[in-house]
Amino acid sequence: NYTPFGHSDWQTIVSKVKKFASSGKKTAVVSTINGDANIPFYKELGNQGIKAEDIPVVAFSVGEEELAGLDTKPLVGHLTAWNYFMSIETPENTAFIKKWHAFIKNKKRVTNDPMEAHYIGFNMWAQAVKQAGTTNVDAVRQAMYGQKFKNLTGGVAVMNTNHHLSKPVLIGE
């Protein structure tokens, strides 16, 4: 099933998944739900008593920010594939989170994958400007290709010639 952005009524769809699984067929959900729509989806899984050991969910667009403030006990065992998790313990990530909390003046605010991507991208841009010796767009663009920068969660991001980063993928529960 596909839904529009911001969809919030998951009762029917989750019921269909539950009914399909009740026929004894191995069932899993591959979720590409984006943003705030994740909250009512996961709440509905809990409302219908769906547990990861019965119908596991693997999501490709949900992070700690979307789940902040949500009772995550019913979500134990479901998985998400993302390039960044705030909970990863590295010296770089710890320093990044500390700086973010000092800037925002709120220790409850989480960091997320887009923030890490911007952090990496800005630092790569700064490296490319230094390498090019100018801020000229064409020169910097050429210098961007092949730039490398250490991720906050370990590993290295690489800027490819298609203007996309190659970064490690993490699986979180």
Go through the PLM ranges and name each one.
Residues 3-5, 62, 83, 145:
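Residues that form or immediately flank small-molecule/cofactor binding pockets and catalytic motifs
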Residues 34-37, 92, 117-121, 167:
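Catalytic-loop motifs flanking and including active-site residues across diverse enzymes
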Residues 1-48, 87-95, 157:
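Extracellular/periplasmic Venus flytrap/periplasmic-binding protein
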Residues 10-14, 115-122, 126:
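Short, amphipathic alpha-helical "lid/cap" segments that border enzyme active or binding sites
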Residues 45-119, 129-135:
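Extracellular/periplasmic periplasmic-binding protein-like sensory domains
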Residues 102-115, 124-173:
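Segments of small-molecule ligand-sensing domains
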Residues 30, 42, 46, 58, ...:
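Generic hydrophobic alpha-helical scaffold/packing signal
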Residues 16-19, 99-102, 146:
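Residues within well-ordered alpha-helical secondary structure of globular protein domains
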